[in-house]
Amino acid sequence: GTELDMSKDPGAGPHALPYRWRPMTWKYEGKPFVHERTTATQQTGFSFVAQARNWLPNPIGGIFWFGVDDAASTVYFPAYCGITSVPEAYAEGKGDMLTYCSDCAFWTFNKVSNFSYLRYDVMHAEVAKVQNELETRFISNTQLIDNTAKELYQNDPKKALQYLTDYSANTGNYVVNRWEKMFQFLLVKFMDGNVKQEENGVFKYNKYNLCPDHVNNPQLPDWWKKIIIDATGDKLVQPEPKK
């Protein structure tokens, strides 16, 4: 990174969190300071990428790639502009800012993002891996969906709209279900500050098949250790063993 990399200064903490919580402006010894804001922010309600293809019929040519919560950890799914209803998990009335909803997009994505902020350096890598996998799949499916919808549209526009509605709804709901599994995976793997061993999403048990195999505990970076030592002096120094 560069000197502008917000994951590298002490404000990021030992786990390289690029975000800075409010207040963004603050003072020290009477001098004003400001935290910079990342391109993707934690308080994002929703974001989208609008794709317009004028060579296709209007209901097919427009795609609203839609995602909720933090843009850096959301998954954008394709909502064709000709759909007649939205995925249930994204529908109005599914919880609100003060009412938790276990099967709606907003709260499911917030569970994952807010948990990953605790150990961003290791958790966000897991999030990004599945995020890229899903979005790559949706993008690669686009031409097939376009062609099928176009063929239906030529004969019966209503069938084409229903096809697109079903596809967008199923895709959006699938994303939320997959993200709930993402949260469960993160909780199991990173619970209590440990990192459990797994391979392709399958956790490893010890030889007794009762407890996890040996857990990993990544070291804190040296610069963070120095901050602790500078603040505590000799308080945390281990005494020499008695001979």
Predicted regions mapped to residue ranges:
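C-terminus-biased signal that marks the final domain/tail of proteins
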Residues: G1-K243
